[in-house]
Swiss-Prot record:
It is found in: Nucleus. GO terms for molecular function: RNA polymerase II transcription regulatory region sequence-specific DNA binding. The lineage of its organism: Eukaryota, Fungi, Dikarya, Ascomycota, Saccharomycotina. It comes from Saccharomyces cerevisiae (strain ATCC 204508 / S288c). GO terms for biological process: negative regulation of transcription by RNA polymerase II; pheromone-dependent signal transduction involved in conjugation with cellular fusion. One of its GO terms (cellular component) is nucleus. Encoded by the antisense strand of the FYV5 gene. This is Antisense of depressing factor protein 1.
Amino acid sequence: MGKCSMKKKGVGKNVGVGKKVQKKRSISTAERKRTKLQVEKLNKSSETMIPTLLREASTQEPAKLKAETTLKAEELIKDQEKDSKVREQIRTEKSKTNDSMLKQIEMISGFSL
């Protein structure tokens, strides 16, 4: 019979340009051992953590935990008032310092600003 004039797909000059071909590489024995040791180490640490976490969860009461973590509105209001007083004291001290410096400059220079 005659020759087929159909070209195979992918046969040409620029086929596969820019495409990286990933080669399958086998995992080395050292890498296997290292990974196995890491997995065993993580399993061992999780095995020791689980019983302690279960014990802690069963001993504490949920209502008690909630009371410890919530902020009390009265305490917040008191703290805000205390903070505002402290800020006001800082402002007054700053203004006193500025006035004192201004007076000193006026005394040194001999005229008022």
